[in-house]
Amino acid sequence: MPNPKKPKIAFAHLGCDKNRVDTEHMIGLLAAAGYGVGTDETEADYVIVNTCSFIQAAREESVRTLVELAEANKKIVITGCLAQHFQGELLAELPEAVAVVGSGDYQHIVEVIERVERGERVQQISAVPTYIADETVPRYRTTPAPVAYLRIAEGCDYRCAFCIIPHLRGNQRSRSLESIVSEAHQLAAEGVQEIIIVSQITTNYGLDRYGQPQLATLIRALGEVDVPWIRLHYAYPTGLTPEVIAAMRETPNILPYLDLPLQHSHPEVLRAMNRPWQAGVNDRLIERLRQELPEAVVRTTFIVGFPGETESQFEHLCQFVQRHEFDHVGVFTYSPEEGTAAYDLPHQIPEEIKRARRDRLMELQQPIAQRKNAAEVGKIVPVLIEQENPQTGEFIGRSPRFAPEVDGVVYVKGAATLGTIVPVEITAADIYDLYGIIPASVRFYP
């Protein structure tokens, strides 16, 4: 129970699912220390804002949130990547900021609040983040009850020319295999139906700790955990080895779903990005994946408008997308990030051209996505039920082809229980979502 003598704390979460795990650990630590924690900023003595600083748009969202809270005269604790990136500027510009906490220092959040309560203005920032929480650190999940993110590593050893993450999050540090499997068993005991494996580069898991990547070994170990769906995010092209693909194929609870950010298709652009660039590398990977795991659902992301990207190179990317027909595609316009190799490159692309290229690529993808979804009509597929509309009685869930937050959903009619996986007959589809009914003869998916 919260200690009424301690201040009330509200959280505002921004950013990626790795950042969400940090938020959940901070909530868990504060709750374990007796603090009342919630989302009601009006009642809170302090608002902790866990920020993102990955690209300009994310920084702008973080700053807007901070300014709104400052205008409401809230005492703000700024955590996460924006704090890591701009700690001095934030303290100088926001008198309401009583503390800044770096991306590798969230484990100190209770001590930070205690110091603030004593009148100190706290700057808790490690110059080089090295921390990663394990299964022993308290955590309060903020996702829908049947879903949990499981972070297997933090930081990144690669230096993609456009990416500031290594500066914000440090180099890769992997958890032990035993620690990860232990947390997976904890989540299973809590009734979790879907675990989403995350890190900066999931396919590099274990390289720093064991001397070589151990994702295939981890996949097989997670196959012993009583969770029906386990999903992998953030694969790196060269890390998707035959051993990893075989482990996915042979482990029943690993969904045949891959989040595989490719960023571009043209070798010259990929080389400038400091990505795997040898001619045809991504084509060969997709072809091998389709051959060895033909049922795989593939999500990818691309960056358009990278410095020097020509019209012909962009056309190469368009043809690549049309040729491979990915299930889900996200497109970002290049965001120049100070401190990255690409920031000072010549031939920066005007914003209006970047936006036009993004829009064209998404327009090319839409009929592909429509066809992929339409192919589901008439099938009976498992759907994890996550929400209910009390007005209509309709449920909202996801099939294995949809990851939370980034992909579509399935709108379901029929009798179901929240947090369960049920069979749904797909009756209709649009570009992003599916629609279906629960057959009367079967209530729950085995």
Swiss-Prot record:
One of its GO terms (molecular function) is metal ion binding. GO terms for cellular component: cytosol. Its cofactor is [4Fe-4S] cluster. Its main location: cytoplasm. Binds 2 [4Fe-4S] clusters. One cluster is coordinated with 3 cysteines and an exchangeable S-adenosyl-L-methionine. It catalyses: L-aspartate(89)-[ribosomal protein uS12]-hydrogen + (sulfur carrier)-SH + AH2 + 2 S-adenosyl-L-methionine = 3-methylsulfanyl-L-aspartate(89)-[ribosomal protein uS12]-hydrogen + (sulfur carrier)-H + 5'-deoxyadenosine + L-methionine + A + S-adenosyl-L-homocysteine + 2 H(+). Gene3D superfamilies: Methylthiotransferase, N-terminal domain, Nucleic acid-binding proteins, tm_1862 like domain. Residues 142-371 form the Radical SAM core domain. [4Fe-4S] cluster 2 binds at residues 156, 160, 163. It is found in: Cytoplasm. Signal peptide: none annotated. Its EC number is 2.8.4.4. Residues 7-118 form the MTTase N-terminal domain. InterPro entries: Elp3/MiaA/NifB-like_rSAM (IPR006638), Methylthiotransferase (IPR005839), Methylthiotransferase_CS (IPR020612), Methylthiotransferase_N (IPR013848), Methylthiotransferase_N_sf (IPR038135), NA-bd_OB-fold (IPR012340), Ribosomal_uS12_MeSTrfase_RimO (IPR005840), rSAM (IPR007197). Residues 374-440 form the TRAM domain. [4Fe-4S] cluster 1 binds at residues 16, 52, 81. PROSITE patterns: MTTASE_N, MTTASE_RADICAL, RADICAL_SAM, TRAM. Keywords: 4Fe-4S, Cytoplasm, Iron, Iron-sulfur, Metal-binding, S-adenosyl-L-methionine, Transferase. One of its GO terms (biological process) is tRNA modification. PANTHER family: RIBOSOMAL PROTEIN S12 METHYLTHIOTRANSFERASE RIMO, RIBOSOMAL PROTEIN US12 METHYLTHIOTRANSFERASE RIMO. Catalyzes the methylthiolation of an aspartic acid residue of ribosomal protein uS12. Belongs to the methylthiotransferase family. RimO subfamily. This is Ribosomal protein uS12 methylthiotransferase RimO. The gene is rimO.
